[in-house]
A protein has these predicted regions:
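Non-heme Fe(II)/2-oxoglutarate
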Residues: 5, 203-204, 208-307, 311-320, ...
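Double-stranded beta-helix
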Residues: 21, 149-208
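Short, surface-exposed loop/helix-turn segments at secondary-structure junctions
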Residues: 125-127, 172-185, 214-216, 235-240
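Short, conserved beta-strand element in jelly-roll/cupin
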Residues: 133-150, 223-226
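Charged, low-complexity interaction regions
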Residues: 338-342
Length: 394
């Protein structure tokens, strides 16, 4: 039986012209053994200790935490081991080399785990650049696994040469997953721990579930732009990196939260790019999207419990999810309207529990469930029915 995908077999051992030509042509490149096995084991150990610490801070055991949380942002800001990794010349020089820029700037970094026995699903097809509030798509990301990753272990998949297609609006992981299953140019990239995949910011990519028993598939991802990139909040005003930006639109990113590497000559920087590079995410009042899921669900609950009629402001989702009386009222009123059945009480309680854990983890540690499953289940089984009911009353 033939595979439904191609497997990437081309590897490079150094920053060569051949490697650069491959990246320019295909939109990705694999560098073998950039970091040592012991270095990756140390980073993985730091990640485990951090997870235990965060779980304890939230009153959870590690198993329960791992069933709910799988992504941690801004690792370089909180963990010295990852700050050291991010500033390592092997990583910096690779990013500079493939971007063909002497000076580069970090957008953000994060770690994503896909443990076989816990939180483990598909991260849908997407390009990276449309999520970033900057004015140039000529950028890249690095993907470094801390364990060996096989073709069945949640490795990266790319659409070969798709960086040449141009910029698309940001993909909504909840409502609008892209489908490239019929394409013959989808390539899976198995890699050893410490190797590095470099992706152009316009290359379409995803990861499938990890099907390899006994593995966790932790990977460190860093995302980079040229230092001449300028702030464009109109392109991505919803992304969490905006929390760290202190400059005005059209200015270069502040270096305290977006560290710069390599000498930057601002006098030679190109003028601000005001082109409409993409139209931004499609946000509809009648549906759910990942770009505004948290305030949208808070708005649903605000109306379900009648706080809108009492003139009370909308509270944060974490406050609603942590309020037993709110959860009780939502269940009873949803049951009364025929939106859910009596035997779904525990199911709805589970939705609230997951939203509480997700919201708390993000507020405390900038950690989250990258799959948005609790938000999606709320919308498809509860939220959409309430919205239809309200629409019929108006």
């Amino acid at each position: 039986m033939s595979k439904a995908f191609q497997e990437s077999e081309i590897r490079f051992n150094n920053l060569s012209e051949e490697a650069l030509e491959f990246f320019v042509e295909h939109g990705y490149v694999v560098l073998d053994s950039v970091f040592g096995v012991e270095e990756m084991d140390e980073s993985n150990q730091v990640l485990e200790e951090m997870r235990k610490r965060y779980a304890g801070d939230m009153g959870l055991d590690l198993e329960s935490y791992d069933e709910r949380i799988c992504q941690w942002r801004d690792m370089w800001m909180t963990e010295p081991q990852f700050d050291e990794l991010l500033r390592d010349n092997r990583l910096i020089q690779a990013a500079q080399f493939f971007m063909r820029q002497p000076s580069i700037q970090l957008i953000h970094d994060h770690v994503i785990r896909k443990p076989f026995s816990a939180l483990n699903s598909t991260i849908p097809w997407h390009q990276d650049y449309p999520f970033w509030p900057v004015d140039t798509p000529d950028a890249l990301s690095t993907w470094t696994p801390m364990e060996d990753v096989t073709t069945s272990g949640g490795c990266l998949e790319v659409v070969d040469k798709s960086h040449k297609w141009g910029v698309s609006p940001p993909v909504d992981f909840i409502m609008d997953p892209m489908d490239f299953s019929e394409r013959k140019d989808v390539i899976r990239i198995p890699v050893k721990k410490g190797s590095m995949v470099v992706l152009h910011s316009l290359t379409w990519h995803r990861t499938n579930p990890n099907e390899d028993k006994g593995t966790n598939r932790p990977a460190h991802i860093s995302l980079w732009v040229p230092s001449f990139a300028r702030y464009r909040p109109d392109l991505s005003d919803w992304h969490p990196v905006n929390d760290h930006i202190t400059v005005e639109a059209g200015e270069h990113l502040n270096v305290d939260k977006f560290p710069r590497f390599g000498e930057f000559d601002e006098s030679n920087a190109p003028s601000p790019n005001s082109d409409e590079l993409h139209t931004g995410p499609l946000k509809l009042e009648s549906t759910m999207d990942m770009f505004s899921a948290t305030p949208r669900i808070a708005g649903h609950i605000h109306r379900i419990i009648g706080d809108n009629q009492r003139g009370l402001p909308v509270r944060k989702l974490v406050d609603y999810a942590n309020d037993e009386e709110v959860r009780r009222v939502v269940f009873e009123r949803s049951l009364e309207k025929g939106i859910i059945s009596e035997d779904q009480e525990k199911w709805l309680e589970g939705i609230f529990e997951r939203m509480l854990i997700n919201s708390t983890a993000y507020l405390r540690h900038r950690a989250r469930n990258v799959y948005n499953d609790a938000y999606a289940q709320w919308w498809f089984h509860v939220g959409v029915k309430w919205v239809e009911l309200w629409d019929n009353l108006e």
